């Protein structure tokens, strides 16, 4: 019989962090973050990491494991997570995966596409063409791989670059290659989803962004930019700097627009990201959904989820 792993998923701002800690205590679990930006060191406020106090309450994994000037693939994430999961089981605890990033979750449960290594010279060549002619790369991808282009936002240069890079190196469309996935991790995944009414979620997001600014996000971004400038070995776009909050504040610090405009953009893009997460998670199979609209009684919500989980975990 496959060992069981619990996944707690939901859109950004829904309350997963606080809820996960309470569920973990009830389950005697350790938490594994599946957030692609919480992996980066020094990026605490903008990624809404669990506080140090929260991490003392329950052991957390996959947080602060990579420098923001480094690159970290989904494949690398999975390799580390496999070891983390086994060690949690050795301690006779339950792994509680909290996310987050749909790609990480899907890689765990369904497998991952293993593409070629990054070609920085090719990426720089493509980026130079994009600078000379904005929109060039997305239009090129639409010609080469229209199926993949339909799934990527025109502004998502990192994913557009990767799709083009794979095509030029493999001579095949990434949409075709992604059908040939590696095997998923060999566990029984129990998926719990938490959601809120969209209007309420958007209000929470706006309040959270304001709180991040008041908590020192601008200074945090300035510090991260200084560290990257001092340590980065490549001029290629860094995934860490594409994180919502960091990208917009960096633009403000570069005098591209005002702080008010940066805050407006962060709120707008965070809402768009939450909407994409809704769409992504709704496509996932076998999720037990809990609508927590209007609720912040996380102790009671955790007990309700634990009650539902207990029957499944002890089968």
Curated annotation (Swiss-Prot):
Positions with a binding annotation for substrate: 12-17
What protein name does the entry list? tRNA dimethylallyltransferase
Where along the sequence does the record put site: Interaction with substrate tRNA?
101, 123
Q: Which UniProt keywords apply?
A: ATP-binding, Magnesium, Nucleotide-binding, Transferase, tRNA processing
**Which cofactors does the annotated protein need, by name?**
Mg(2+)
- EC number of this enzyme: 2.5.1.75
Reaction(s) this enzyme catalyzes, per UniProt:
adenosine(37) in tRNA + dimethylallyl diphosphate = N(6)-dimethylallyladenosine(37) in tRNA + diphosphate
Q: Which GO terms describe its biological process?
A: tRNA modification
Its family remark reads: Belongs to the IPP transferase family.
For ATP, which residues are the binding ones?
10-17
Top-level division of the source organism's lineage = Bacteria
- GO molecular function per UniProt: ATP binding; tRNA dimethylallyltransferase activity
Q: Where is this region: Interaction with substrate tRNA?
A: 35-38
Please name the InterPro entries in this protein's record: Dimethylallyltransferase, IPT, P-loop_NTPase
Subunit record text: Monomer.
Q: What does this protein do?
A: Catalyzes the transfer of a dimethylallyl group onto the adenine at position 37 in tRNAs that read codons beginning with uridine, leading to the formation of N6-(dimethylallyl)adenosine (i(6)A).
Q: Which Pfam families match?
A: IPPT
Gene name, please?
miaA
